[in-house]
């Protein structure tokens, strides 16, 4: 007959194997639900973006050796419905607004202006006007934003209870050319 240790090992191996199978099933079914809900083609409307540029000499705002740097914040309108990102395995959704721009000839920079954690499906509809960005950004290369084209996009990250993180971005973006007159 089998000893107690062999029986315990047999039962624990069975439980572990079944646990792995359940986790894989949960991951696959929740990803399938995201595809079924068209989560990868959620529309967003980013509008009315206004830049607020300050010149700062503090090292907390990117200045080095007392040389002034332009710091930019924005005001924007955002309208999107992120309810397709929620299913039974969604713990929370992390949403963030980014801007891409060419800092030098061959380098594209991407910076984050705003983010939010959405914990329930009830809060998944975002409709805000004249919202001020959470973060102030500066360009590391030359420190000037004027004349640069910024392409704003809304990204999301689904954080599940079980499984891998799922990343994506909404459909719709906003392009803005920074002008010199917006300095504060």
UniProtKB/Swiss-Prot annotation:
Topology of this chain in the membrane: Single-pass type II membrane protein
What job does this protein perform? Essential component of the signal peptidase complex (SPC) which catalyzes the cleavage of N-terminal signal sequences from nascent proteins as they are translocated into the lumen of the endoplasmic reticulum. Essential for the SPC catalytic activity, possibly by stabilizing and positioning the active center of the complex close to the lumenal surface. Essential for viability.
Parts of the chain on the Cytoplasmic side: 1-14
Q: Name one GO biological process term.
A: protein targeting to ER
By sequence similarity, the record places it as follows: Belongs to the SPCS3 family.
**Where can this protein be found?**
Endoplasmic reticulum membrane
Subunit comment: Component of the signal peptidase complex (SPC) composed of a catalytic subunit SEC11 and three accessory subunits SPC1, SPC2 and SPC3. The complex induces a local thinning of the ER membrane which is used to measure the length of the signal peptide (SP) h-region of protein substrates. This ensures the selectivity of the complex towards h-regions shorter than 18-20 amino acids. Interacts with SEC11. SPC associates with the translocon complex.
Q: Which residues lie on this side of the membrane: Lumenal?
A: 36-184
Q: What is this protein called?
A: Signal peptidase complex subunit 3
Q: Which gene encodes it?
A: SPC3
Major localisation: endoplasmic reticulum
> What residue ranges are annotated as transmembrane?
15-35
Which keywords does this Swiss-Prot/TrEMBL entry list? Endoplasmic reticulum, Glycoprotein, Membrane, Signal-anchor, Transmembrane, Transmembrane helix
List all annotated glycosylation positions. 102, 173
Q: Which GO terms describe its cellular component?
A: endoplasmic reticulum; endoplasmic reticulum membrane; signal peptidase complex
Misc note: Present with 6840 molecules/cell in log phase SD medium.
Matching PANTHER family:
MICROSOMAL SIGNAL PEPTIDASE 23 KD SUBUNIT SPC22/23 (PTHR12804), SIGNAL PEPTIDASE COMPLEX SUBUNIT 3 (PTHR12804:SF0)
């Amino acid at each position: 007959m089998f000893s107690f240790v062999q029986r315990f090992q047999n039962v624990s191996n069975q439980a572990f194997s079944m646990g792995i199978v359940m986790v894989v099933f949960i991951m696959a079914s929740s990803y399938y639900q995201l595809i079924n809900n068209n989560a990868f083609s959620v529309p967003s409307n980013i509008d009315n973006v206004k830049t607020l540029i300050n010149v700062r000499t503090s090292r907390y705002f990117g200045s080095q050796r007392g040389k002034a740097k332009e710091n930019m914040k924005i005001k924007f309108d955002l309208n999107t419905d992120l309810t397709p990102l929620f299913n039974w395995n969604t713990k929370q959704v992390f949403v963030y607004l980014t801007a891409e721009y060419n800092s030098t000839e061959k380098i594209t920079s991407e910076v984050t202006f705003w983010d939010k954690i959405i914990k329930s499906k009830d809060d998944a509809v975002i409709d805000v006007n004249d919202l001020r960005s959470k973060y102030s950004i500066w360009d590391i290369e030359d420190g000037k934003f004027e004349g640069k084209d910024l392409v704003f996009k809304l990204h999301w990250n689904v954080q599940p209870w079980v499984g891998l993180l799922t990343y994506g971005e909404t459909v719709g973006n906003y392009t803005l050319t920074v002008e010199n007159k917006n300095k504060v």
